[in-house]
A protein has these predicted regions:
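Conserved catalytic phosphorylation-site environment of P-type ATPases
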Residues: 54-122, 274, 292, 414
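Small-residue-enriched core segments of transmembrane alpha-helices in multipass membrane transport
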Residues: 13, 39-57, 381-402
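Re-entrant/interfacial helical elements at transmembrane boundaries that shape
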Residues: 58-67, 105, 133-137, 294, ...
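Actuator/coupling domain of P-type ATPases
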Residues: 1-43, 331-338
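Conserved ATP-binding TGD loop and adjacent catalytic N/P-domain core of P-type ATPases
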Residues: 160-162, 203-341
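ATP-binding catalytic core of ATPases
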Residues: 109-153, 174-189
Length: 416
């Protein structure tokens, strides 16, 4: 974490400075008042300036923040991302499985029942959410003997009985030179708003039919979108779905901007453009989102998503609750406000107490004469006795560390 590294670097210089200062203080008071006074002031400097408060300022706040996040079902895999999150200005979302519910359902298809059952059996071999929805849509329990191949961002290919089957998007069929008839295109167009997720099924060079799937927006997506608007945070949807469907969802949620019909590579290029505008947060769930999750400044992965997506995300939403993103943002702001307070206290404490331990008040008092400052209860007399013994210096050091700990404990509270 950048701020932790900076504090560690300062602490290293601070220790060297204090050792040098203690030596100078010892030499000064040895010449001025003798060894007894020299040992007193040098020991006080070493004890009161122990960099515990400085060293505790960042790590204890982070530990408590991570603990708070865990209680709210947010797994922080990369603590450095917690520092960046508070600076985020753009929140970018995948749609399917992220803003919409993971569970898909078959809305309509124009396949024969035997072809539909065959497609569902083939999809049973893929871990993709669309494949899971299809595999559970058929009551037939077919046993297949063939060669399965997953084609990322496009679909699957299955070779069986001297035939090649394709199941996936339009780009997959175009890649293998399979044309789609006007009847199939019209079928897709008639369902593109209600069921924007389309799976084409082809055998050799013939498109057998189309399956249209649908899923609803997550209940909490509206709450997150409202939070982003209230905090003047820009929101974007990057989706591979058709434009009409994405536009409808963006309108429902009040998302500021959207891009549709994107491949995984298109998403990466779009994300890189957005990163030129500021710190970007990307939220995704699928295998196709893994590259974008890795590239983003800060990333959230859904726990129900693919293992690859979860390994790439900086945060994992354990309960798949999008409202946890808003909580993490508030936690990031609170954590670094407290870290700044801790660091201010640590530096303020050292700036005030080290001169006292070094005997500066006594030294100043030695230049003040009674006629100039007045009576026996003069400022000079007060300053002359204003010094710290080693045991008082040690107590002051303990108090400074305790103050940092108590301030950090405020991170245990629920942020609402």
């Amino acid at each position: 974490m950048p701020i932790a590294k900076l504090v560690d670097k300062i602490s290293a210089y601070f220790v060297g400075f204090i050792l040098l200062l203690a030596g100078v203080v010892f030499a000064f008071w040895a010449v001025k008042s003798g060894l007894n006074s020299a040992f007193l002031h040098a020991s006080a400097v070493l004890l009161i300036s122990c960099p515990c408060a400085l060293g505790l300022a960042t790590p204890i706040a982070l530990v408590l923040a991570i603990n708070n996040a865990t209680k709210h079902f947010i797994l922080i895999k990369n603590p450095a991302s917690l520092e960046l999150l508070r600076k985020a200005k753009l929140f970018i979302f995948d749609k399917t499985g992220t803003l919409s519910k993971e569970t898909l359902s078959v809305f309509a298809h124009n396949l024969t029942q035997s072809d539909f059952d065959l497609l569902c059996a083939m999809e049973n071999l893929s871990p993709h959410p669309i494949a899971k929805a299809l595999s559970s849509a058929s009551a037939a329990n077919l046993s297949l003997q063939g060669e399965f191949e997953s084609l990322p961002a496009r679909g699957i290919r299955y070779k069986m009985a001297n035939h090649t089957y394709l199941a996936g998007n339009a780009a997959l069929l175009a890649e293998f030179g399979v044309s789609v008839s006007k009847a199939h295109k019209d079928f897709v167009k008639s369902h593109e708003v209600q069921a924007p997720i389309v799976v084409y099924f082809a055998k050799d060079k013939e498109c057998l039919g189309v399956v249209c799937l649908t899923n609803e927006l997550r209940d909490e997506a509206q709450d997150l979108a409202e939070f982003l608007r209230k905090n003047s945070l820009h929101s974007v949807i990057l989706s591979g779905d058709n434009e009409k469907s994405v536009a409808l969802n963006a309108q429902k949620l009040g998302i500021d901007e959207f891009k549709a019909n994107l491949s995984p590579q298109d998403k990466i290029e779009a994300l890189q453009e957005y990163q030129k505008k500021g710190v970007c947060v990307f939220v995704g769930d699928g295998i196709n989102d893994a590259a974008a999750l890795s590239l983003a400044n800060v990333s959230f992965a859904m726990n129900s998503g693919s293992a690859l997506a979860k390994s790439a995300g900086d945060f994992v939403l354990i309960k798949d609750d999008l409202r946890a993103i808003a909580y993490a943002f508030k936690l990031s702001q609170k954590t670094f406000a407290i870290i700044k307070q801790n660091l201010f206290w640590a530096f303020f404490y050292n700036a005030c107490c080290i001169p006292v331990a070094a005997g500066v008040p006594s030294f100043v008092a030695s230049f003040a004469t009674a006629p100039k400052i007045a009576t026996e209860t003069s400022l000079a007399q007060i300053l002359a006795h204003f010094t710290l013994t080693p045991h008082l210096a040690a107590l002051a050091m303990c108090f400074s560390s305790l103050a940092v700990v108590l301030n950090s404990l405020r991170l245990k509270k629920d942020l609402g």
